[in-house]
Design a protein with these regions (language model features):
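Protein maturation boundaries and topogenic segments
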Residues: 1-111, 119-122
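Short coil-to-beta-strand transition motifs
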Residues: 47-48, 134-144
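Flexible glycine-/small-residue-rich
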Residues: 55, 135, 159-161
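Short, charged beta-turn/beta-strand-edge "cap" motif at the junction between a beta-strand
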Residues: 120-125, 136-139
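Extended, hydrophilic extramembrane loops/domains of integral membrane proteins
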Residues: 146-162
Length: 162
């Protein structure tokens, strides 16, 4: 038995074969998928402890030459440029440039960013915070809270992609 364990250990850590490489990948995947990810979920209080941004809804740049419904052939990416095009919506909904400038992740997220999450506490969620929630699609949505209100003892949040 001891000899078998030694051979297995040697195969995983010292063998240079493709089979050793593949075995390491499979074991790493299984450990992350069934131990690390659930443990993180338990500690952070969420079923999605790690998510990747898969859409451009929180980016502050152009996509297909469009940003906030306006077409640009060139767009200098900066907070001021973003606000000059998209800020009108926020201002018409009671959010000033100064307020937005103090929001967490004021520059949004880029497609491909990886985010570590923890369970939100509804008692301290406010306009400007970023929420990740399950919509009608299988992928979770990442949007910014733009309005909070109570109705019939229920708290509601309006969210918007930047």
């Amino acid at each position: 038995m001891k000899e078998h364990l030694k051979k297995t250990w040697d195969f995983f850590w010292n063998d240079e074969s493709i089979w050793s490489w593949l075995a390491n990948i499979v074991v790493a995947f299984l450990v992350i998928r069934f131990l690390v990810y659930p443990f993180l979920g338990l500690i952070l209080g969420t079923s999605f402890p790690i998510v990747a941004v898969i859409s451009e809804s929180m980016e502050h740049g152009t996509h297909a030459d469009l940003i906030c419904g306006e077409k640009f052939t060139e767009f200098p990416e900066s907070f001021d440029s973003y606000w000059s095009v998209c800020g009108q919506w926020y201002e018409s909904n009671g959010i000033t440039k100064e307020q937005f400038n103090k929001f967490p992740f004021r520059d949004g997220f880029r497609k491909g960013d990886v985010i570590i999450l923890w369970r939100a506490n509804k008692n301290n969620l406010d306009v400007g915070d970023v929420l990740i929630f399950q919509g009608s699609k299988p992928q979770p949505l990442i949007h910014r809270v733009v309005k909070v209100w109570e109705e019939d003892s229920q708290t509601y949040y309006q969210t918007k992609g930047d």
